[in-house]
């Protein structure tokens, strides 16, 4: 929201002279330019945590991916001294791109490509990312950023990012409705959806294996539901890591 406001303000004051106009122009363009790279960085961290739910992995990923962001942040500070490496503000308060502007777009592209590779790698390793909205966010963002690069003077970058966030929100709602909260496996609602889809599109035979946990009620009675929930989570993790790529583990709960 801050970046959208800053970008709008930078377009409104561009070429207009008033007290403090140069400082305001520098601040607005620094915010909307620097935050573009920040979005790519935060998107990767969001993806990492959403897939693995591990703070240790998240901290390692944040450190590794933080180097390009830190380098850009340092250059943005240098740019504030008026050397125009990323952008320059003329004596008439007009914004122009600097010679190192492509570095910003390349950095964002690297972050987006990294998120796509991370999602595909997680899927290859057996994690449930069938509904994860990687492309729903990346594609609108890339379209908007590329359009803004090619057609100088239009503002589509942050508008496309906002659209990407809307797509992500809608897709995550669908994903959450199909996933069991405790086990992390797909639920019976997804089973019904999956079977209906297979009946319409797949001609090959479909097989299923139904497993039951022995004495699970006794675990809850003797040790409490907290321990029982932990057992369900462990079972879900074991099943997710054990099934082949063309199989889908689900939790049907009580039938």
What function would you assign to each model-found segment?
Residues 1-6, 59-71, 95-149:
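Alpha-helical transmembrane segments of multi-pass integral membrane proteins
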Residues 1-45, 65-82, 134-149:
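Hydrophobic alpha-helical transmembrane segments of multi-pass membrane proteins
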Residues 16-19, 85-93:
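Membrane-interface helix termini and inter-helical loops of multi-pass transporters
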Residues 24-34, 93-104:
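Short aromatic-rich membrane-water interface segments that cap or initiate transmembrane helices
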Residues 33-45, 106-115, 164-167:
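Hydrophobic cores of alpha-helical transmembrane segments in multi-pass inner/ER membrane proteins
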Residues 48-55, 86, 123-126, 151:
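Membrane-interfacial segments
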Residues 118-120, 124-182, 188-199:
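Signal-transducing coiled-coil linker helices
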Residues 187-207, 217-244, 250-254:
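Conserved long alpha-helical elements within nucleotide-processing catalytic cores of c-di-GMP signaling
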């Amino acid at each position: 929201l801050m970046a959208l406001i800053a970008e709008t303000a930078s377009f409104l004051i561009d070429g207009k002279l008033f007290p403090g106009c140069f400082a305001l122009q520098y601040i607005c363009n620094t915010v909307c330019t620097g935050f573009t790279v920040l979005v790519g960085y935060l998107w990767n961290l969001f993806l990492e945590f959403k897939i693995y739910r591990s703070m240790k992995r998240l901290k390692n990923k944040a450190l590794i991916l933080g180097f390009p962001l830190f380098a850009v942040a340092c250059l943005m500070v240098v740019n504030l001294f008026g050397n125009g490496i990323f952008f320059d503000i003329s004596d008439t308060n007009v914004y122009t791109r600097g010679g190192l502007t492509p570095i910003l777009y390349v950095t964002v592209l690297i972050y987006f490509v990294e998120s796509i590779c991370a999602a595909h790698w997680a899927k290859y390793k057996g994690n449930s990312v069938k509904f994860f909205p990687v492309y729903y966010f990346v594609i609108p963002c890339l379209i908007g950023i590329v359009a803004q690069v090619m057609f100088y003077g239009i503002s589509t970058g942050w508008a496309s990012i906002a659209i990407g966030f809307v797509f992500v929100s809608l897709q995550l709602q669908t994903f959450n409705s199909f996933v069991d909260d405790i086990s992390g496996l797909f639920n019976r609602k997804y089973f019904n959806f999956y079977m209906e889809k297979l009946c319409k599109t797949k001609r090959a035979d479909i097989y299923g294996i139904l497993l039951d946990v022995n004495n699970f009620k006794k675990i809850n009675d003797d040790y409490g539901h907290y321990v029982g929930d932990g057992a369900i989570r462990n079972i879900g993790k074991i099943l997710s890591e054990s099934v082949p790529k063309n199989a889908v583990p689900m939790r049907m709960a009580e039938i």
